[in-house]
Each structure stands twice: as C-alpha cells, then as structure tokens.
Amino acid sequence: MPHLSSASRQRLDGAHPLLRELFLAVADKAAIEVLESQRGRSAQERAFALGHSRAHFGQSAHNWSPAIALDVVPAPLDWTDLPRFRALAALVKDEAKLRRIPLVWGGDWARLKDMPHYELDPWRRFALEARLVDG
C-alpha cells in the first residue's frame, strides 16, 4: 500500500478517479506529498491575486469536483531542488503513459512553470462530467 500522509490521502480522495489511480501508483515508487486538489472560489481568487495562478474561479482544473488537477511534490519538499521535481514528473508521465491516462505537467508550460501541477488533458472535457467546488 502506498505511503501517503493523511492530509495527502484526503486531498487525493477529492481527485478524479484517474488521478487517484495514477498517484497511488506513483506513491508506491516515490515519496510524494499532495499539496492541493480541489480549490474553492476564495482560494482560487487568492491564488490569482498572489500570482500563483493565471485563472479566476471556474477557469482552473482545481475548481471542480472531482478535482481534475493535483499539485504534487517530491517529499520531503524543497522548492529549490528542481531536479527532484523533474525526476518526479518523469515518473508520473511514465506511469500515465503506461496507464493511458491523458496528462499535462505544469512544468512543461511555456509561460508560467508550475512544477507541482498535473492535470488531466484536456481538462475542460473532464469538467463536463464534474461540478464546480462550493466555497
């Protein structure tokens, strides 16, 4: 069984079943922490105001239930250790490919590099089967 903190497990429980499957498999192979899954209106607008997101509420894959995006980091977390983020991303992408889970990593984005961010692709298609998060 994967080792995840209770907080990471709770966040993962709010994610789309494909993301849960993927990151449970990843947790069997690497130490990870799930920082965020669902993000309500106030949290999304705060992230936008702080420059941590370019999306207003309803325009982010985090704003849906089940969550269509997760923020996942290598554990223990060291924001300055970018090679560990890249190594985790390689593992996540390999697992996603193996499982045929369509995925985008925020570290591959041209403008705002979002190293912890993983989302189902295309997330707006998955949003058609979800609902906006309350709050």
Language-model features: where?
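Active-site acidic/histidine clusters and adjacent loop/turn architecture
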Residues: 1-33
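Generic alpha-helix detector with strongest preference for long hydrophobic helices that associate
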Residues: 3-7, 53, 73
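Short linear motifs at secondary-structure transitions and domain/linker junctions
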Residues: 8-12, 43-51, 93
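Short amphipathic alpha-helical surface micro-motifs
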Residues: 15-17, 51-55, 100
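Short, well-structured alpha-helical interface segments that form or flank functional binding sites
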Residues: 17, 21, 42, 87
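Extended, low-complexity, intrinsically disordered C-terminal regulatory tails
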Residues: 23-52, 98, 104-106
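Catalytic cores and adjacent binding grooves of peptidoglycan-active enzymes
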Residues: 55-135
